[in-house]
Amino acid sequence: MGQKVNPTGFRLGIIRDWTSRWYDDSPVIAEKLKQDHVIRNYVQARLKRERAGIAKIVIERTTKHIKINIFAARPGAVVGRKGEEINNLSQELSRITGREVKIDVIEVIKPEIEAQLIGENIAYQLENRVSFRRAMKQAIQQAMRAGAEGIRIRCAGRLGGVEIARSEQYKEGKIPLHTLRANVDYASVTAHTIAGAIGIKVWVYKGEVLVQRIDAIEEDELKKIKDRRGEQRSRGRDSRNRRRRKPRQTT
């Protein structure tokens, strides 16, 4: 199960949250979801030229406006000089959506362990005719040095411009895909090369989450079990004592 399913969707509601954080039970919910998709594609295409390194885009909606949180490795490229870029982007999105748009930019502290940024970096190198093996190995080394506990990268397509398509992957560390508390970041990126499209998949294991919470729950359960056993033992002792104290009937 864990080997086949998308690791992000597999962990939604457990250790991962949705990137569209709003609720609507009206019939226009499909239009709003489509609008979110358009916003993400527009922002990524708009900032791709600036090499801002967009790791994630989170959209929140209220009755009055739309709030967009952009997680970027280079927030200065998103904001621009004196905030010109972010103001222009906000105005363009307001024209597209027909509502007021507010944009917040959050800096990504460690871009070397963000799966989306790793995939985009490899795709950029492949499109500029860098060896796929060199790009993959370099990304793995950088991620492990930055603190990742495990990483796996798979490239599929006409690697090196050969006639027959194939897939190759490199891995270092561990990737526990079946463990739901394991924080596994996943991304899928396509590189458009002269030989054709090359698919890039990246898995990054950043460690376990909810460990303290799980330990606390287990300790609480153990305490309850011990208390229950103690009560049962005390009841057993009381019943034995009552039987011993019961006077014998004499004829």
UniProtKB/Swiss-Prot annotation:
Part of the 30S ribosomal subunit. Forms a tight complex with proteins S10 and S14. One of its GO terms (cellular component) is cytosolic small ribosomal subunit. Residues 222-239 have a biased composition (Basic and acidic residues). NCBIfam families: rpsC_bact (TIGR01009). One of its GO terms (biological process) is translation. Pfam families: KH_2, Ribosomal_S3_C. CDD domains: KH-II_30S_S3 (cd02412). Residues 39-109 form the KH type-2 domain. HAMAP family: Ribosomal_uS3_B (MF_01309_B). Binds the lower part of the 30S subunit head. Binds mRNA in the 70S ribosome, positioning it for translation. GO terms for molecular function: mRNA binding; rRNA binding; structural constituent of ribosome. Residues 222-251 are annotated as: Disordered. Residues 240-251 have a biased composition (Basic residues). This is Small ribosomal subunit protein uS3. Belongs to the universal ribosomal protein uS3 family. InterPro entries: KH_dom, KH_dom-like_a/b, KH_dom_type_2, KH_sf_prok-type, Ribosomal_S3_C_sf, Ribosomal_uS3_bac-typ, Ribosomal_uS3_C, Ribosomal_uS3_CS. Keywords: Ribonucleoprotein, Ribosomal protein, RNA-binding, rRNA-binding.
